[in-house]
């Protein structure tokens, strides 16, 4: 049996060094400030870690097994727990004591015994709906977890309601209606153009299902919703199965193709879809979408080129780095040409956009994101005010980095943006992590409280906040103070 040894890939050095361990820490130390009394609930986070080295030198950061994290806030204290999501893939590799899966999402590069195996890693985000907690990755079905222990319950099709082969890692849980809006892309298998939109009611029962075809089989990492429309952007990061079968990348950048946006009726069917198109571009994450009369605005961290340079053109030619900027894309429902209007909102590079979740799909003022404008590798948490055009930021310090933030309302009916941001921070020079709590309306003032972790929590992708009463009742207690 070969020794376990990771490659010299920079991905596995420094902060990216695999953790490969599960942790339980009760009563984390609060090294600054005090935990707000109203913070009662759990911050769930999900990310990738490496169970075994792949033996390749071209691994990418979005691959790896799901490592699920939770920060539980209870009576002024915070506890931390992390657990592997024991997917079918994880269990196969555990039994084999080595990596069995090759290039990202390319089963033709797997070990022979894993060629036809389920490849889902459940490594991207956390979803809580109708009393159930899930770990998600967009090329597979959800995995249900115990919300208290994080032990894996198992892969699920939600009682037969998921009819596609895949399920998004960016669902939208509306905390006002308690509806779940989700989708599947390449829904009939690798390289298919099929996409499926799902609407589930507050009890987890499927209320609508709409199938249609994309212009090309591509990566659809995120989408957005309004009160009447579901917004699907299609960017030319395309799957060519001939390339995949030859051992190449699952996605390839095809700038000769156009960008397309489909507006799908939230409560209708495929006959009501509206189509728009523009030049080749890309985006990983949507901040929000809003309907304004006959127009639909999509606010997105927009790249004027390829957002995933590790998925180059089919000839392997490198694509130049292009920074993402907060941009508003507008679709006019009365337009005859289907053009997309583009308007940059902020001249500062940013990613991982979030909002006050109560205002997803509704008129809103505040957007939160990671801001990149330092030359020392550090990053900041930002709040953009759409009304004033101003940016408020919190910086953790030289060389330190922030992860995606999570907004928590101060009260169930507090005004939009009145609450806290929970922000995981990488204390790079110390080799450990913090969780900082910020006043969402005054980031520049610094943390309300800082919770110290005595360990390094490898960077996670996305997460969600679940109030304590929601874990027991299955329903969110929120109300809209104003729209």
Label each region the model flagged.
Residues 1-483:
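Beta-propeller domains
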